[in-house]
């Protein structure tokens, strides 16, 4: 059983050639496989912001996937920020 203390919110900013290559769709698929809720949003400057909430271990696995060589496009750098989950998220959306 996952307690509230084991829940986390990951915000990751993915830099590189990650727009127009299916990166957000790929991220959504990985997040849903891991049981996470959140979003993947295109930002200016060839960045995608990924927000995911759920079990910390699942968020860590998503972060590993974002940094892996298996992503669509070409990831140069992933910056991360961890915080307490805010809740209210359902599903995983592409924006």
From Swiss-Prot:
Residue ranges annotated for the Acylphosphatase-like domain, each copy included: 9-95
EC number: 3.6.1.7
Reactions that this protein is recorded to catalyse: an acyl phosphate + H2O = a carboxylate + phosphate + H(+)
Family annotation (InterPro entries): Acylphosphatase (IPR020456), Acylphosphatase-like_dom (IPR001792), Acylphosphatase-like_dom_sf (IPR036046), Acylphosphatase_CS (IPR017968)
Alphabetically ordered keywords of this record: Hydrolase
Enzyme type, top EC level: hydrolase
Superkingdom per UniProt: Bacteria
MF term (GO), any: acylphosphatase activity
Active site: 24, 42
PANTHER family: ACYLPHOSPHATASE
Family in the record: Belongs to the acylphosphatase family.
Name of the featured protein: Acylphosphatase
């Amino acid at each position: 059983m996952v307690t509230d203390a084991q829940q986390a919110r990951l915000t990751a900013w993915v830099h590189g050639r990650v727009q127009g290559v299916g990166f957000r769709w790929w991220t959504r698929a990985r997040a849903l496989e891991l049981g996470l809720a959140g979003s993947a949003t295109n930002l200016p400057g060839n960045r995608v912001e990924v927000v995911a909430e759920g079990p910390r271990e699942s968020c860590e696995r998503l972060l590993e996937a974002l940094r892996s060589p298996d992503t669509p496009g070409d990831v140069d750098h992933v910056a991360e920020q961890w915080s307490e989950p805010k809740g209210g998220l359902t599903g995983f959306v592409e924006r």
